[in-house]
C-alpha cells in the first residue's frame, strides 16, 4: 500500500526519488565506451556485428534501410480509428510547436545594426526503442518539432526483430505520418554511435533525440560533444498537488497512470487534506487490483509511491519545487492561484480535467520532459532544440571609431594586444615595432 507521510519526512522522499537513476553503472559505461569506439572506427562492420550479437539478426547495407513496402504493410496493420487519433495528435503537436518558432531578426541602425540569425539543423537522428517500449506517440513528439523547425533531413533508428523487420510496425506508421526521411533497422548503443559518427550506410547527424534503455542513455552521454543530444532521461515521475475539491478516484487514477510505466517510476501526492489522503490511498488499492500491469504498479508504489500531507498548499508547492518533477498536476480549486508558486516542473497540468495522459498523447505540448529533478535547469523538447542561433553585428566606420578607445582599453586590460590592434589598425593607430 502507498504510504502516507508528514511534510517533515519529505527530505527522505526527495532522496529516494532523486536517486532512482541507474545511469551510474561502471560496467555499462565500459561496455558502451567499447561499442562507441568500435563503431566509430569500423563503421558498418562493427554496427552489423553488434546487431547480430544483441538483436540476433543479420543486417547488411542492403537490408538495413526500411523500404516503402514495409511501411505499407505497417499501415495495413493499423486500425482506421488509431490512424485518425494519430493524425489528430500530429495536428495538435504541430500547431503548438508552430508557436515556438523564432525568425531571424535584425535591428537596422545607421551606427550599428544588431540581430540574430536562426538556422535549422541540417540532419537529426531520432532513436525509437523496440518492442513494447516503441511508443508511436514518442515518434511524433521527437520528429514534429524538428519538422516545424525546418530540419532538412530526419532519420530514425529502431531495433529489428529476429525476423529482420521492425519489432513494432506502428512506429513506422508514426514516422511516416510525422515526415521522417529514412528509417534504419538498428538499435542500442551501436545505433547511437552510428548516428553520431556516421557509417557507410548511416549518415552522421547533428543531434540525437529519443528515449532508450540504460545502454542507449549512456551512449548518448558518451557521444555528446561530437553531436548534440536532447537530454539523458531517467525514470518518469508525476507529482499531484490536490485539495478537498479533488476527486480521490481521479487522483488515484492519475498516480497509477504513471506507476504503470516502470518499477522505477515515482507517483507522489501532496495534499493539505487528511481526508483526501486516506481516500486516495484506498482508491489506489482498489484500482490497482483491476489493472493488468499491477505487478509493475505495486513495485513502483512500494519503492517510490508516496502521499505527503502538509499544513498548506504552499507547503505542498515547496516540496514539489524541491523534487522538480517531470509532470505536475494542480488538482485544486484554484490552480491558477497556485501556479505562481511552482518553479520547477517539466509540464504542469491545471485543474481536475487535465490528466497527465492528455499531455502524453493529444494536448499538443511535448511529452519529452526533464526527469529526476532536472526540471530545475532543463526544459521540454521544443523547436529551439532543432535550431542554432548566430549573432549578427554590422558596424559603421563612424561608430567603430567612436567606441574604439573603449574597445582597445578593455582588450589591453586583458593582455590581448592583437585584439586592440585589430581596431587600431583601421584608424592608422596600429602597433609599431
Regions found by a protein language model. Give the residues of each.
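N-terminal Rossmann-like NAD(P)+-binding subdomain of aldehyde/semialdehyde dehydrogenases
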Residues: 1-122
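Alpha-helix C-terminal capping segments
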Residues: 141-152, 176-178, 196-203, 220-222, ...
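General beta-strand structural signal in soluble alpha/beta enzymes
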Residues: 105-108, 126, 156-158, 182-188, ...
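Conserved small-residue-rich beta-alpha loop and adjacent elements
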Residues: 107-173
Amino acid at each position: 500500500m502507498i504510504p502516507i507521510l508528514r511534510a517533515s519526512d519529505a527530505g527522505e522522499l526527495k532522496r529516494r526519488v532523486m536517486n532512482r537513476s541507474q545511469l551510474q553503472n561502471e560496467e555499462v559505461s565500459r561496455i558502451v565506451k567499447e561499442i562507441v569506439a568500435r563503431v566509430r572506427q569500423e563503421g558498418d562492420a562493427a554496427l552489423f556485428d553488434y546487431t547480430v550479437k544483441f538483436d540476433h539478426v543479420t543486417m547488411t547495407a542492403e537490408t538495413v534501410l526500411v523500404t516503402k513496402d514495409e511501411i505499407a504493410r505497417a499501415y495495413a496493420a493499423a486500425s482506421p480509428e488509431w490512424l485518425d487519433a494519430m493524425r489528430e495528435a500530429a495536428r495538435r503537436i504541430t500547431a503548438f510547436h508552430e508557436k515556438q518558432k523564432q525568425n531571424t531578426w535584425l535591428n537596422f541602425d545607421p551606427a550599428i545594426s544588431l540581430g540574430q540569425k536562426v538556422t535549422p539543423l541540417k540532419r537529426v537522428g531520432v532513436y525509437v526503442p523496440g518492442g513494447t517500449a516503441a511508443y508511436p506517440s514518442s515518434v511524433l513528439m521527437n520528429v514534429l518539432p524538428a519538422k516545424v523547425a525546418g530540419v532538412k533531413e530526419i532519420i530514425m533508428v529502431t531495433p529489428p526483430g529476429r525476423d529482420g523487420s521492425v519489432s513494432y510496425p506502428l512506429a513506422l506508421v508514426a514516422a511516416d505520418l510525422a515526415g521522417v526521411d529514412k528509417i534504419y533497422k538498428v538499435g542500442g548503443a551501436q545505433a547511437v554511435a552510428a548516428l553520431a559518427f556516421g557509417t557507410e550506410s548511416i549518415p552522421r547527424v547533428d543531434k540525437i533525440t529519443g528515449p532508450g534503455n540504460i545502454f542507449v542513455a549512456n551512449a548518448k552521454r558518451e557521444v555528446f560533444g561530437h553531436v548534440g543530444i536532447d537530454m539523458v532521461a531517467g525514470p518518469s515521475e508525476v507529482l499531484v498537488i490536490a485539495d478537498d475539491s479533488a476527486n480521490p478516484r481521479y487522483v488515484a487514477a492519475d498516480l497509477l497512470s504513471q506507476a504503470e510505466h516502470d518499477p522505477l517510476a515515482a507517483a507522489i501526492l501532496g495534499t493539505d487534506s487528511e481526508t483526501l489522503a486516506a481516500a486516495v490511498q484506498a482508491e489506489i488499492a482498489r484500482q490497482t487490483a483491476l489493472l493488468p500491469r499491477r505487478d509493475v504498479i505495486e513495485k513502483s508504489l512500494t519503492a517510490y509511491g508516496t502521499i505527503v500531507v502538509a499544513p498548506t498548499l504552499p507547503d505542498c508547492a515547496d516540496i514539489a519545487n524541491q523534487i522538480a518533477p517531470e509532470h505536475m498536476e494542480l488538482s485544486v480549486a484554484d490552480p491558477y492561484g497556485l501556479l505562481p508558486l511552482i518553479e520547477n516542473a517539466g509540464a504542469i497540468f491545471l485543474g481536475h480535467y487535465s490528466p497527465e495522459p492528455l499531455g502524453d498523447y493529444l494536448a499538443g505540448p511535448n511529452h519529452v520532459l526533464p526527469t529526476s529533478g532536472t526540471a530545475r535547469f532543463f526544459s521540454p523538447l521544443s523547436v529551439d532544440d532543432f535550431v542554432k542561433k548566430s549573432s549578427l553585428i554590422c558596424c559603421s566606420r563612424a561608430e567603430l571609431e567612436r567606441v574604439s578607445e573603449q574597445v582597445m582599453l578593455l582588450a589591453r586590460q586583458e593582455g590581448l594586444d592583437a585584439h586592440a590592434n585589430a581596431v587600431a589598425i583601421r584608424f592608422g593607430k596600429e602597433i609599431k615595432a
